[in-house]
Amino acid sequence: MTSTNFRPLHDRVVVRRVESEAKTKGGIIIPDTAKEKPQEGEIVAVGSGARDEAGKVVALDVKVGDRVLFGKWSGTEVKLDGEDLLIMKEADIMGIIG
């Protein structure tokens, strides 16, 4: 997504899903039709932050490059520069991996 000029507003982030393994530990190959969409992703863009009661901008806890876990139904799916991405609020992110 480096070629796009898209920047999310406020406390929103853009997430690229990280694809899960197509094969189980036992060697069984999982077809695409049986896979659930992954709930893990990489942050590719962040907004400037939300405003607190005093009007001061509060920076987000996540940054570009962070690997995160998010809820199954979190975010809005969009296509930017031909790539399928999610736009969600930082509050929809459950945590940072690693």
Swiss-Prot record:
Q: GO molecular function terms here?
A: ATP binding; metal ion binding; protein folding chaperone; protein-folding chaperone binding; unfolded protein binding
How is this protein annotated for GO cellular component?
cytoplasm
A Pfam short name? Cpn10
Q: Which domain of life is it from?
A: Bacteria
Which controlled-vocabulary keywords does the entry list? Chaperone, Cytoplasm
Q: What does this protein do?
A: Together with the chaperonin GroEL, plays an essential role in assisting protein folding. The GroEL-GroES system forms a nano-cage that allows encapsulation of the non-native substrate proteins and provides a physical environment optimized to promote and accelerate protein folding. GroES binds to the apical surface of the GroEL ring, thereby capping the opening of the GroEL channel.
**Stated name of the protein:** Co-chaperonin GroES
| Organism (species) | Agrobacterium fabrum (strain C58 / ATCC 33970)
